[in-house]
Swiss-Prot record:
Organism placement in taxonomy: Eukaryota, Metazoa, Chordata, Craniata, Vertebrata
DNA-binding region residue numbers: 10-85
PTM sites of type Phosphoserine: S203
Zinc fingers classed as NR C4-type: ranges: 13-33, 49-73
CDD domains: NR_DBD_Lrh-1_like, NR_LBD_SF-1
SUPFAM superfamilies: Glucocorticoid receptor-like (DNA-binding domain), Nuclear receptor ligand-binding domain
BP terms from Gene Ontology: female gonad development; hormone-mediated signaling pathway; male gonad development; positive regulation of gene expression; regulation of transcription by RNA polymerase II; sex determination; tissue development
Amino acid composition bias (Pro residues), ranges on this chain: 126-139
Protein name: Steroidogenic factor 1
Functional description taken from the UniProt entry: Transcriptional activator. Seems to be essential for sexual differentiation and formation of the primary steroidogenic tissues. Binds to the Ad4 site found in the promoter region of steroidogenic P450 genes such as CYP11A, CYP11B and CYP21B. Also regulates the AMH/Muellerian inhibiting substance gene as well as the AHCH and STAR genes. 5'-YCAAGGYC-3' and 5'-RRAGGTCA-3' are the consensus sequences for the recognition by NR5A1. The SFPQ-NONO-NR5A1 complex binds to the CYP17 promoter and regulates basal and cAMP-dependent transcriptional activity.
Organism the protein comes from: Equus caballus
Any Pfam family matching the protein: Hormone_recep
Record-listed N6-acetyllysine modification sites: K34, K38, K72
Cross-link Glycyl lysine isopeptide (Lys-Gly) (interchain with G-Cter in SUMO) mapped to chain: K119, K194
Family per record: Belongs to the nuclear hormone receptor family. NR5 subfamily.
Length: 461
């Protein structure tokens, strides 16, 4: 749905620089980019770029490369789910609260400009400095190994990490008897790790959930109820770390000639994902869905949730020259540069750039849990039995995040939009990571019984 716009604010389309005509699909854009985005989504068009996928898009050149134009539409924040699938006029009215608040902010901004006698100019987002350049090189430390917390034995020595090629992966609708079945409901056939207690972990002495949960967060004024509930669902990080380290101490079931460091990273990712599945099972709305819908949602976003979990850990870590693993171990980026191939190294550096961007945005825990919820309830997923419930969850999370950012970061009026743009980059990173894993699998380099590979294969069947 299009919303009226104050022309005297004189903003330019973030895609091509043409004059803005109104709010279209979640963003202020021109009429041309509005129509282009709508036609692309409704007709399910797929473009290719004849150059290097970095074509300049402006008012005069916007029709030369539809691939780069559509990518820019997504990058600046146009929303796929706002386009109606039935080709009727008018978009899906899910961004009404955002439009109204955004308009109020712009009216306030216009009044300040008139009062101060300044001319409104387009520029970088308010309160968000540009990310610094990639970190410099550092001295190489010893290789990757399992840490030794609380008396656990040390892990095997490190080995080199490999390289890969990266063609696109096919995407398909998952089935209900895939790799997640045994995690969501233990009665379903699946792998050995069940929904409550993963097999490599010893049963706790007293009954209870697999992970400890913090005390309810009071939050103070301006914290929406949804975010308060999500904060209570977050598992205790120390317990998650201890469980994953304990699992890594178990004898590996993979190929014995595999590089130890790569095997460990795969097993870390597996166990991290299991903790994410446990979190999802406890989420409001998600636990109300049928098992088939639960599996569809998780199989759609598992890689994004893993990437976002890693990114937020680095934001908390706060060190540009190293990466903090889920086990609590620091790995210098130059270790990756020395042991990994150029493509994997590029993926790590790209992730680091996103970390710097989120750090500049001052991403906090309240925003993290809400964004994670938004990733889980993506409206891009098709063939859901209860799409309306997922849509309602997405709308409530969007509203909660917008209200929170406006209340707690009034000096950054566009923080809500900038956070959603970060999710676009999270998705791009997750696709690149899946391509890396898949080609490791094709090269017979992945550990056996790897859950992530099973997730990839479920996408293709």
């Amino acid at each position: 749905m299009d919303y009226s716009y104050d022309e005297d604010l004189d903003e330019l389309c973030p895609v091509c620089g043409d004059k803005v005509s109104g709010y279209h699909y979640g963003l202020l854009t021109c009429e041309s980019c509005k129509g282009f985005f709508k036609r692309t989504v409704q007709n399910n068009k797929h473009y290719t770029c004849t150059e290097s996928q970095s074509c300049k898009i402006d008012k005069t050149l916007r029709k030369r490369c539809p691939f780069c134009r559509f990518q820019k539409c997504l990058t600046v924040g146009m929303r796929l789910e706002a386009v109606r699938a039935d080709r009727m006029r008018g978009g899906r009215n899910k961004f009404g609260p955002m439009y109204k608040r955004d308009r109020a902010l712009k009216q306030q901004k216009k009044a300040q400009i008139r009062a101060n006698g300044f001319k409104l100019e387009t520029g970088p987002p308010m309160g968000v400095p540009p990310p610094p350049p990639p970190p410099p090189d550092y001295m190489l430390p010893p290789g990757l190994h399992v840490p030794e917390p609380k008396g656990l034995a040390s892990g095997p020595p490190a080995g080199p990490l490999g390289d890969f090629g990266a063609p696109a992966l096919p995407m398909a609708v998952p089935s209900t008897n895939g790799p997640l079945a045994g995690y969501l409901y233990p009665a379903f056939p699946g792998r050995a790790i069940k929904s409550e207690y993963p097999e490599p972990y010893a049963s706790p002495p007293q009954p209870g959930p697999p992970y400890g949960y913090p005390e309810p967060f009071s939050g103070g004024p301006g914290v929406p109820e949804l975010i308060l509930q999500l904060l209570q669902l977050e598992p205790d990080e120390d317990q998650v770390r201890a469980r994953i380290i304990g699992c890594l101490q178990e004898p590996a079931k993979g190929r014995p000639d595999q590089p130890a460091s790569f095997n460990l990273l795969c097993r870390m990712a597996d166990q991290t994902f299991i903790s994410i599945v446990d979190w999802a099972r406890r989420c409001m709305v998600f636990k109300e869905l049928e098992v088939a819908d639960q599996m569809t949602l998780l199989q759609n976003c598992w890689s994004e949730l893993l990437v976002f979990d890693h990114i937020y850990r680095q934001v908390q870590h706060g060190k540009e020259g190293s990466t903090l693993l889920v086990t609590g171990q620091e790995v210098e980026l130059t270790t990756v540069a020395a042991q990994a191939g150029s493509l994997l190294h590029g993926l790590v550096l790209r992730a680091q750039e996103l970390v710097l961007q989120m750090h500049a945005l001052q991403l906090d825990r309240q925003e993290f849990v809400c964004l994670k919820f938004l990733i889980l309830f993506s409206l891009d997923v098709k063939f859901l039995n209860n799409h309306s419930l997922v849509k309602d969850a997405q709308e409530k999370a969007n509203t909660a995040l917008l209200d929170y950012t406006l209340c707690h970061y009034p000096h950054c009026g566009d923080k809500f939009q900038q956070l959603l743009l970060c999710l676009v980059e999270v998705r791009a990173l997750s696709m690149q990571a899946k391509e890396y894993l898949y080609h490791k699998h094709l090269g017979n380099e992945m550990p056996r019984n790897n859950l992530l590979i099973e997730m990839l294969q479920a996408k293709q069947t």
